[in-house]
């Protein structure tokens, strides 16, 4: 992994009581040692693998103004990170759920792209066994479960300031308010809606195959082809490219998929990030509610699984052996 740290700073927020968040600021930057670089490589890997929301700075963003000055050499990175951590503390203090944590700012380069990553990491306790097989306590940064993270593509921001996608962030696992306070701190608003783009792609694909008058098997083959392409892009950390996807679908219709989406007004970007959960709908049907969870391969619809829209009834012919065994035990009075 070609990740080069330019500058990295750590600070800390300590929750003393319900109303107090204490600020602990470092007086110097971290040295980019092999351990620090390994930690950042892991953080980059974990963050890159997650579904992210996309955004852009508001005109009045204090963070953007300070970052611009820092990039122009008018403010050093340590001073920038210290001031930003103070603003983060002030923003967090407005919320009753506010917790402390390790605040990390890192400017780094990965594959010719410069990034600024900002995150609040939990510092957790655990146990370790040493070479003498003695047990002692230790602390570690919970990188795998980080949910307060934002990353600015500095290269994109500086070369294409009108972009709506140079800033990415996680919405958090504990509710909308987590991303609210972080967006307020960043002075940012949501931009490109990747999930909406993926849903638009699926709708366009359904309409495209319908207009091409493909039969059921052909339609499913096209969906599988698109799913394979999108999955490969996702695994490679690349975006869905409408032009390259259109080439994948050459021969399906006299009109290319790219021309079809443009003519029909689907408003798809030339490229956009893949959304894993949305793309699963290409090959799977899934849903849950009212104590019922259903998940099956799309190819089974009309073969072993039938839906009657008039009565909203799903009929399954041939149940999985483990499910059938449970049903037989329960209906026969067994346990």
UniProtKB/Swiss-Prot annotation:
Provenance organism = Enterobacter sp. (strain 638)
The protein's name: Nucleoid-associated protein Ent638_2782
Name a GO molecular-function annotation.
Answer: single-stranded RNA binding
- Primary localisation category: cytoplasm
The record's subcellular location field reads: Cytoplasm, Nucleoid
Q: Which family does it belong to?
A: Belongs to the YejK family.
Keywords attached to this entry? Cytoplasm
Question: Entry's InterPro entries?
Answer: Nucleoid_associated_NdpA
Q: Which domain of life is it from?
A: Bacteria
Q: Which GO terms describe its cellular component?
A: bacterial nucleoid; cytoplasm
